[in-house]
Amino acid sequence: MYEFTPVGWLKHCVFHPVEGFEDLRWKKQGSMKISMLIVLFLFIAMVVDRQLTGFQFNDSYVKVFNVVPLIVQSVVYFFTWVLGNWAICTLLDGEGTLKKICIYSAYSLVPYIVCTFIAVIFSNVLVQDESIWITAIQYLGIGWSVILMVRAMRAVHQY
């Protein structure tokens, strides 16, 4: 078992998901402040992706920007996931609390957020023929976050 700062626990969970989420559970660590900050960064990443993606790769360019759909797609969907996961875990004898599900789920989104920012930067540098790199980075972030989410839910509910 390790002694980490709250940010250290986040890095430990992202880079060592099997061990990290189990250690997080047994040490009763995890910061609600950091998880809310991650959800805020998720919203910011979606806004940046929508507005700042290079014009060659941006299919959603509009003159009027509406933030409400992005709030729904990031913050509302996240809390719907947390609440739904908690409701199902109570029916299936999971051990996760609402707070732990929120923390673990937010920690799992970090690779997606980071890869979204990297893809936006690359979209402003690369040409259309090199779009495979942007797609690969996006799929890497999604896949890594899905793996982390599965491991996190397995650890938090003890399935």
Please give the residue ranges for each predicted region.
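Alpha-helical transmembrane segments with an aromatic anchor "belt"
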Residues: 58-123
